């Protein structure tokens, strides 16, 4: 899906794309873990990584990959769109990265099926695949967030 399509789908469901900071918090919790499940490199049972082109896997193939908040499948297989524009860290919500106009390069998080195991971390950021929010890619997915 495109970033715009993902954003529109989430809105249709009464939700929104998470910000980059929200995505990272959901993936790593408060203990600063390297991967959603802890600090050990992933196994093939936990995530899809290091695979060839166009080799995503059904998400039900994986287990033991829950984040501290119980969120599943946040590392590997497909990058996730977030609402935030790609900007250098450190994160600052007031630096324009949360502007929702479609123009800027958007961030993706989590790593994809072809990412190496040591790059599907809770802090991994992408922008190469997401340069155009109007273009989709087979290696980008999304999840929706809601306000509580």
Language-model features: where?
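Functional-site microenvironments in short loops/helix caps that host divalent-cation chemistry
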Residues: 1-129, 136-138
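Short, structured beta-strand segments at or near domain termini in extracellular proteins/domains
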Residues: 136-148
């Amino acid at each position: 899906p495109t970033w715009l399509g993902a954003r529109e789908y989430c809105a249709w469901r009464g939700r929104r794309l998470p910000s980059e900071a929200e995505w990272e918090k959901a993936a790593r919790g408060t203990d600063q873990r390297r991967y959603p499940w802890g600090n050990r490199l992933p196994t093939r049972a936990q995530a899809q990584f290091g695979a060839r082109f166009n080799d995503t896997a059904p998400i039900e193939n994986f287990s033991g990959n829950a984040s501290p908040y119980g969120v599943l499948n946040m590392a590997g297989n497909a990058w996730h769109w977030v609402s935030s524009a790609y900007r250098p860290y450190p994160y600052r919500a007031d630096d324009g990265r949360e502007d929702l106009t479609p123009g800027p390069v958007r961030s993706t998080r989590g790593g994809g099926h072809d990412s190496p195991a040591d790059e599907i971390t809770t802090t991994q950021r992408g922008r190469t695949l997401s340069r155009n929010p109007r273009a989709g890619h087979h290696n980008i997915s999304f999840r929706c967030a809601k306000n509580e």
